[in-house]
Amino acid sequence: VNLIDAFGKATETNVPMTFYDKFSGDVRYNIMHTMNVKGNPDTINIDPLGSYNIVVHTVPPVSKDSIVLVPGTHNIIGIDAPQGDLVLKIDGKNDYRELKGIIRKSGEMNTIIAQDFNTSQRLIVGEYDLEILSTPRIYASNVHIDQSKTTTIQIPSPGIANFQYNNPGYGYIVQEVNNKLNLVHTLNNNATRESVVLQPGNYRVVYRPKNSQSSQYTI
């Protein structure tokens, strides 16, 4: 199986492949694509009877259907699978316990993968939209992944806002953006102290004690 890069060469490798029986849909083989000692795609021995649908588990996956093999010969199957790398990183200290970026194809809503920050992820060449699960959310549109190149998305280091109250209450954090206030976090209404990791920006807190029965006690 030749995994073809953007230049028409069989250089892509080290991804799992699944061979399905075309008619029954059963999994016939799971194989990790490998280059042999000569740097060529390794030859695999499989049953030539029947036909196969092949899925290459890149991100997102690529596939080729209705593969018919000729018995007793060296069959070559080419599948386009050009890949590059996406790195997500924070500029400085990371106060998040866990921060991920949701990756989608540009203009689509289906999630392809949730990538951890400070990691690298191989992706099929193309354009992607990112939703970073920070507070508040950060969005990046039309992020381009090129063949064998690394694209880096870096966000500013966050800060921590500490809250302490005499009594539990209803509290919300809103961000000031272009003279508008956008809700970014709901505070725990059963706690008297809380720490919230926030991206740099201007914020306001709206709070009222839980046992107060008048809006004039809003802070």
Label each region the model flagged:
Residues 1-9, 84-93, 160-167:
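A short, amphipathic beta-strand motif
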Residues 7-29, 92-110, 167-184:
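Short, ordered, surface-exposed loop/turn motifs in non-cytosolic proteins
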Residues 14-16, 51, 85, 98-100, ...:
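Exposed beta-strand and adjacent loop surfaces of beta-rich binding modules
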Residues 29-38, 67-69, 108-115, 143-144, ...:
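Short beta-strand segments within Ig-like beta-sandwich modules, predominantly Fibronectin type-III
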Residues 36-53, 57-60, 117-137, 190-212:
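Short Pro-Gly-centered beta-turn/loop motif in secreted/extracellular proteins
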Residues 37-38, 58-82, 135-156, 210-219:
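Structured interaction patches on ligand/partner-binding surfaces of diverse proteins
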Residues 49, 72-74, 148, 158, ...:
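Tight coil/turn sites that cap or link beta-strands
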Residues 156, 161-210:
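Intrinsically disordered, low-complexity segments enriched in Gly and acidic/Ser/Thr residues
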